[in-house]
Amino acid sequence: MACVSTCLILSPRLTQVGLSSKKPFLIRLRSPVDRYSFPRMLTERCLSTRRKFNRHGIAVVKAASLDKVSGAIKPGGLVESDKLPTDVRKRAMDAVDECGRRVTVGDVASRGGLKVTEAQTALQAIAADTDGFLEVSDEGDVLYVFPRDYRTKLAAKSLRIQIEPFLEKAKGAVDYLARVSFGTALIASIVIVYTSIIALLSSKSEDDNRQRRRGRSYDSGFNFYINPVDLLWYWDPNYYNRRRAREDEGKGMNFIESVFSFVFGDGDPNQGIEEERWQMIGQYITSRGGVVAADELAPYLDVPSSKSAMNDESYILPVLLRFDGQPELDEEGNILYCFPSLQRTASGSSRRKEYVGKWFDWVADMEKFFKEKKWQFSKTSTSERALVIGLGAVNLFGVIVLNTLLNEMSVRPGGFLTFVKNIYPLLQIYAGSFFTIPLIRWFSIKRKNNQIENRNKARLQFARALESPDIALRRKLLSARDMAQKTVIGKDRIVYSTDRDMMEQNYETDEWDRRFKELEKSD
């Protein structure tokens, strides 16, 4: 199996302690892939002489150059974190905080639900920008350690991070403006349509026109057309009182927003849930020692609903790709899945429960299965929806009547009526789409919810099977627990750190010999 080499270039302080004439300093590390192919791995350090050690296959990581650490992790002096996708950077930093700012790649991948490669790239970039440093354990594991104020340092360097809050606020303002504009357009359309209808009816008779103009100053009909927003009070006189009460409670939406909600909905209820799904899966695998059966992950994945396809474990392939997993056979021929990258952690806070029969008790601190939320047609209340539909119908009726009057008009319109005739196609599109779009959405939501319900039922079926496993499944789960390995890398196991001078670390040759002998005996 091929080895992957990683370069660590030490601090420039090392050149100040009289080591420039010495032979290259070597740290021998195994790649994440090779590390688990051999029973143990060794670390070799050479200062004035080279020490050769025995039969263990080892990949070489050279720290021969003592020029400067910035050459290794700060190429070009750029802000490396700006090259990361925003969600990857945020999830990686959240994972770093959760783990106490001392992490392995597996810690960040499992806590953040990131791909192993994404987690490694993010850690390298953030460490480069925040004066983070590396630690190497006695088994060759590389840990990333960040200062307490690393977020402040990163924000001070990155213009992108500084303007992100303003961009998010601007995006929210644009979204709210779009909602308000569409609702306001309904009121404006009603005002324009019915004002035009009145003007066209008035122009039919020169004699009645003057009388109707006088009449409009005194009767209530004119107020109805010129100010149709009064319909809000006619339909629901307590609307604004209820709206104010809901706003005080921190919930609900105003009428203008409810128009947009009725037509276009309120967005995907499962937005961001994929990230949560991968976080659940990563933390589950880590808590089980990095070895699981496919049946254990089925409650969190998109599994087949048919019983004939339940034996097909291809649904676990996305997990293997994301977390660098590989299938292994136990002594009984069961296929189990091992995730070496998630077996090494710098945090010993997560506890692992032994399997005692009840899977639901065993995962009491986690979600039992991944449940997707169903789509809602609209979050508006029944009364708000009725008001929106009523005003939409009033607008549609007015547009139809206006079309008839415009076609029957014998004289050439002028002024306001010319403007209305020019924008009439837009009024038609608005009035028609006001009901066409919700109708299409209703059928689409019904189909999506049926699919979501089927997926949730399939996951629940696997979860119930784990709650009361048969003998074969029980033996498979116990075998996975026997194969599980979890190594907590404490500070007592650190043999090298890039934040200290080499002479300060001053490991004696006898100490190294003792450690290697212990490793050989354990083999």
Curated annotation (Swiss-Prot):
Record's bilayer topology term: Multi-pass membrane protein
Transmembrane segments: 180-200, 386-406, 423-443
GO CC, any one term: chloroplast envelope
Major site of localization recorded for this protein: plastid
Subcellular location: Plastid, Chloroplast membrane
Keywords: Chloroplast, Membrane, Plastid, Transit peptide, Transmembrane, Transmembrane helix
Transit peptide: 1-63
Keyword Nuclease (UniProt): no
Protein name, entry field: Uncharacterized protein At5g03900, chloroplastic
